[in-house]
Protein backbone atom coordinates (compact mmCIF):
# COMPACT_ATOMS: atom_id res chain seq x y z
CA UNK A 1 0.00 0.00 0.00
CA UNK A 2 1.38 3.47 -0.82
CA UNK A 3 2.53 5.16 2.37
CA UNK A 4 0.62 8.39 1.67
CA UNK A 5 -2.70 6.70 0.78
CA UNK A 6 -5.49 7.94 3.03
CA UNK A 7 -6.32 5.20 5.57
CA UNK A 8 -10.02 5.17 4.54
CA UNK A 9 -8.90 3.82 1.15
CA UNK A 10 -6.64 1.01 2.37
CA UNK A 11 -9.03 -1.76 1.28
CA UNK A 12 -9.16 -0.30 -2.26
CA UNK A 13 -5.38 0.13 -2.68
CA UNK A 14 -5.31 -2.73 -5.25
CA UNK A 15 -7.28 -0.47 -7.64
CA UNK A 16 -4.40 2.01 -7.92
CA UNK A 17 -2.66 2.15 -11.27
CA UNK A 18 -3.53 1.92 -14.94
CA UNK A 19 -5.61 -0.88 -16.39
CA UNK A 20 -6.07 -1.68 -20.10
CA UNK A 21 -8.11 -4.21 -21.99
CA UNK A 22 -11.03 -4.92 -24.22
CA UNK A 23 -14.79 -4.72 -23.86
CA UNK A 24 -18.04 -4.97 -25.74
CA UNK A 25 -21.21 -2.93 -25.74
CA UNK A 26 -24.81 -3.43 -26.74
CA UNK A 27 -28.10 -1.61 -26.41
CA UNK A 28 -31.45 -1.93 -28.24
CA UNK A 29 -30.99 1.44 -29.96
CA UNK A 30 -27.46 0.84 -31.34
CA UNK A 31 -25.38 -1.79 -33.12
CA UNK A 32 -23.20 -3.98 -30.85
CA UNK A 33 -19.57 -2.84 -30.69
CA UNK A 34 -16.14 -3.78 -29.35
CA UNK A 35 -13.79 -1.31 -27.70
CA UNK A 36 -10.34 -0.89 -26.19
CA UNK A 37 -10.17 0.78 -22.80
CA UNK A 38 -7.76 2.45 -20.42
CA UNK A 39 -8.72 3.18 -16.80
CA UNK A 40 -6.52 4.90 -14.22
CA UNK A 41 -7.12 5.09 -10.48
CA UNK A 42 -4.83 7.52 -8.64
CA UNK A 43 -4.73 9.40 -5.35
CA UNK A 44 -3.37 12.55 -3.71
CA UNK A 45 -3.47 11.44 -0.07
CA UNK A 46 -7.06 12.61 0.52
CA UNK A 47 -10.02 10.25 1.21
CA UNK A 48 -10.90 9.62 -2.45
CA UNK A 49 -9.45 7.96 -5.54
CA UNK A 50 -9.35 9.91 -8.79
CA UNK A 51 -10.78 7.96 -11.75
CA UNK A 52 -10.16 8.54 -15.46
CA UNK A 53 -11.45 6.33 -18.26
CA UNK A 54 -11.27 6.46 -22.04
CA UNK A 55 -12.26 4.07 -24.80
CA UNK A 56 -11.66 3.77 -28.51
CA UNK A 57 -13.15 1.55 -31.19
CA UNK A 58 -11.42 -1.81 -31.48
CA UNK A 59 -11.87 -1.81 -35.27
CA UNK A 60 -10.24 1.53 -36.14
CA UNK A 61 -8.98 3.17 -32.93
CA UNK A 62 -11.38 6.12 -33.11
CA UNK A 63 -12.26 7.69 -29.74
CA UNK A 64 -15.60 6.55 -28.31
CA UNK A 65 -16.18 7.62 -24.72
CA UNK A 66 -14.50 9.07 -21.65
CA UNK A 67 -15.39 9.60 -17.99
CA UNK A 68 -13.64 11.30 -15.13
CA UNK A 69 -14.46 11.51 -11.47
CA UNK A 70 -13.87 10.38 -7.92
CA UNK A 71 -14.45 7.25 -5.88
CA UNK A 72 -15.10 7.96 -2.21
CA UNK A 73 -15.34 5.68 0.84
CA UNK A 74 -17.63 7.49 3.32
CA UNK A 75 -17.46 4.54 5.72
CA UNK A 76 -15.99 1.02 5.58
CA UNK A 77 -17.81 -1.10 3.02
CA UNK A 78 -19.64 1.85 1.41
CA UNK A 79 -18.84 3.67 -1.86
CA UNK A 80 -19.78 6.91 -3.57
CA UNK A 81 -18.83 7.49 -7.21
CA UNK A 82 -19.06 10.97 -8.75
CA UNK A 83 -18.60 11.04 -12.55
CA UNK A 84 -18.75 13.49 -15.44
CA UNK A 85 -19.13 12.45 -19.09
CA UNK A 86 -18.29 14.75 -22.04
CA UNK A 87 -21.67 13.82 -23.55
CA UNK A 88 -23.33 16.14 -21.02
CA UNK A 89 -24.10 13.61 -18.29
CA UNK A 90 -23.12 13.69 -14.62
CA UNK A 91 -23.88 10.89 -12.22
CA UNK A 92 -23.69 10.04 -8.56
CA UNK A 93 -23.63 6.35 -7.74
CA UNK A 94 -23.82 4.84 -4.27
CA UNK A 95 -23.05 1.28 -3.31
CA UNK A 96 -20.87 -1.11 -1.42
CA UNK A 97 -17.68 -3.10 -1.63
CA UNK A 98 -16.50 -6.36 -0.12
CA UNK A 99 -12.98 -7.73 0.20
CA UNK A 100 -12.48 -11.49 0.41
CA UNK A 101 -8.82 -12.44 0.45
CA UNK A 102 -7.34 -10.81 -2.66
CA UNK A 103 -10.73 -10.32 -4.32
CA UNK A 104 -12.57 -6.98 -4.28
CA UNK A 105 -16.17 -6.67 -5.49
CA UNK A 106 -17.92 -3.31 -5.85
CA UNK A 107 -21.58 -2.66 -6.74
CA UNK A 108 -23.07 0.78 -7.29
CA UNK A 109 -26.18 2.36 -8.78
CA UNK A 110 -27.22 5.91 -9.53
CA UNK A 111 -28.97 8.07 -6.99
CA UNK A 112 -28.71 11.19 -9.16
CA UNK A 113 -28.18 11.90 -12.86
CA UNK A 114 -27.67 15.38 -14.31
CA UNK A 115 -28.19 16.12 -18.00
CA UNK A 116 -27.23 19.17 -20.03
CA UNK A 117 -29.95 20.44 -22.42
CA UNK A 118 -28.30 18.63 -25.36
CA UNK A 119 -27.52 15.31 -23.61
CA UNK A 120 -29.38 12.14 -24.48
CA UNK A 121 -31.83 10.99 -21.83
CA UNK A 122 -30.25 8.63 -19.29
CA UNK A 123 -32.49 7.57 -16.41
CA UNK A 124 -30.45 4.93 -14.56
CA UNK A 125 -26.94 3.45 -14.39
CA UNK A 126 -25.48 0.61 -12.36
CA UNK A 127 -21.93 -0.76 -12.21
CA UNK A 128 -20.30 -3.90 -10.92
CA UNK A 129 -16.50 -4.21 -10.59
CA UNK A 130 -14.44 -7.27 -9.68
CA UNK A 131 -10.71 -6.95 -8.98
CA UNK A 132 -8.79 -10.21 -8.67
CA UNK A 133 -5.04 -9.64 -8.58
CA UNK A 134 -4.03 -7.98 -11.85
CA UNK A 135 -7.43 -8.45 -13.53
CA UNK A 136 -10.31 -5.97 -13.32
CA UNK A 137 -13.64 -6.97 -14.85
CA UNK A 138 -16.78 -4.88 -14.87
CA UNK A 139 -20.25 -4.54 -16.26
CA UNK A 140 -22.46 -1.49 -16.70
CA UNK A 141 -26.22 -1.46 -16.96
CA UNK A 142 -28.05 1.55 -18.37
CA UNK A 143 -31.60 2.82 -18.69
CA UNK A 144 -31.80 5.46 -21.43
CA UNK A 145 -33.83 6.89 -24.32
CA UNK A 146 -37.04 5.18 -23.23
CA UNK A 147 -35.42 1.80 -22.51
CA UNK A 148 -35.39 0.14 -19.05
CA UNK A 149 -32.22 -0.59 -17.08
CA UNK A 150 -30.36 -3.40 -18.88
CA UNK A 151 -26.90 -4.71 -19.77
CA UNK A 152 -24.86 -2.22 -21.78
CA UNK A 153 -21.10 -2.74 -21.31
CA UNK A 154 -18.74 -5.47 -20.13
CA UNK A 155 -14.94 -5.55 -20.16
CA UNK A 156 -11.88 -7.30 -18.78
CA UNK A 157 -8.83 -5.13 -18.08
CA UNK A 158 -5.32 -5.97 -16.88
CA UNK A 159 -2.97 -3.96 -14.70
CA UNK A 160 -0.12 -2.29 -16.55
CA UNK A 161 3.31 -2.53 -14.96
From Swiss-Prot:
Heme-binding protein able to scavenge peroxynitrite and to protect free L-tyrosine against peroxynitrite-mediated nitration, by acting as a peroxynitrite isomerase that converts peroxynitrite to nitrate. Therefore, this protein likely plays a role in peroxynitrite sensing and in the detoxification of reactive nitrogen and oxygen species (RNS and ROS, respectively). Is able to bind nitric oxide (NO) in vitro, but may act as a sensor of peroxynitrite levels in vivo. Pathway: Nitrogen metabolism. This is Peroxynitrite isomerase 1. Keywords: Heme, Iron, Isomerase, Metal-binding. Homodimer. One of its GO terms (molecular function) is peroxynitrite isomerase activity. Forms a 10-stranded antiparallel beta-barrel structure able to accommodate a hydrophobic ligand in its interior. In fact, this fold hosts the heme group, which is located in a wide surface cleft. Pfam families: THAP4_heme-bd. The keyword Heme applies. Its EC number is 5.99.-.-. A motif (GXWXGXG) lies at residues 17-23. It catalyses: peroxynitrite = nitrate. Belongs to the nitrobindin family. It comes from Mycolicibacterium paratuberculosis (strain ATCC BAA-968 / K-10) (Mycobacterium paratuberculosis). It comes from the Bacteria. It is an enzyme of class 5 (isomerase). Binds 1 heme b group per subunit, that coordinates a highly solvent-exposed Fe(III) atom. Heme b binds at residue 152. Its cofactor is heme b.
Amino acid sequence: MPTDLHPDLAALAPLLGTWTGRGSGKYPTIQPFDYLEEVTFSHVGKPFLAYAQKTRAAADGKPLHAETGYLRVPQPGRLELVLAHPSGITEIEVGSYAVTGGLIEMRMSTTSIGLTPSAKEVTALARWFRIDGDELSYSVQMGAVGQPLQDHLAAVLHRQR
